[in-house]
Amino acid sequence: MSKLQILEFPDPRLRTVAKPVQTFDAALGQLIDDMFETMYEAPGIGLAATQVDVHKRIVVIDVSEDKSEPMVFINPDIEVLDGDPEEMQEGCLSVPGFYESVTRIPHVKIRAQDRNGESYEMEARGLLAVCLQHEVDHLNGKLYVDYLSNVKRTRIRKKLEKQHKMRA
C-alpha cells in the first residue's frame, strides 16, 4: 500500500466531475486500499478519489472511533429520505485546518457497488449521512466551501494559497 497525495483547495482538479467505474480489478482494489491508508494517516473519516487526483466515482469512509468499519462506495447514488436539514461542523482533507457549519439532510439512502462490483443499498443517518453527502459532492466537483458565503470561501482560499506559497 502507499499513501496518496491529497489535492488542496483551490486546486482546479478538485472541480473535475468523476466518471463511473467500469472495471473491477486488482488495480481498483489497490487504489481502494491506498485511499484507506491515505484517509487513516491524514487522519480523516472520508475520502473521494477526486481528492487524490483519480477522477473515478469511488468513496471510502470509516466513521468509527477505532477505524474498524471501513466502507467502500463505488458509483454511489444518494436519495434524500426524510428529516429537516441540520447544521453540522464539517472539515475536509482538501481544505486542511478549516471547519465550518454546513446544512445537510440527516437521513439518506445510498445505492452503490462494492470493490467486487456487487450492487447494494443502505440507509444512513447522522454523521455517516453527512459524510456520504460530503464525499459524493467531491465526485461531482463540489466542495463544502461552496455552501459558504463568498466572504468565508475567499478568506479560506487566500489563507490556503498563502500556506502553499510558504511551503513552496
Swiss-Prot record:
Q: Keywords in alphabetical order, please.
A: Hydrolase, Iron, Metal-binding, Protein biosynthesis
Q: Is Hydrolase found in the keyword set?
A: yes
E.C. numbers = 3.5.1.88
The protein's annotated catalytic reaction(s) are: N-terminal N-formyl-L-methionyl-[peptide] + H2O = N-terminal L-methionyl-[peptide] + formate
Q: A single GO molecular function, which one?
A: metal ion binding
Per UniProt, where does Fe cation bind? 92, 134, 138
**Which Pfam family, an example, fits this chain?**
Pep_deformylase
Instruction: Name the Gene3D superfamilies on file.
Output: Peptide deformylase
> Which catalytic residues are annotated?
135
Q: Which GO terms describe its biological process?
A: co-translational protein modification; translation
Cofactor binding note of this UniProt entry = Binds 1 Fe(2+) ion.
Question: What does the record give as cofactor?
Answer: Fe(2+)
Q: What does this protein do?
A: Removes the formyl group from the N-terminal Met of newly synthesized proteins. Requires at least a dipeptide for an efficient rate of reaction. N-terminal L-methionine is a prerequisite for activity but the enzyme has broad specificity at other positions.
Name the protein family. Answer: Belongs to the polypeptide deformylase family.
What is the name of this protein? Answer: Peptide deformylase
Organism of provenance: Hahella chejuensis (strain KCTC 2396)
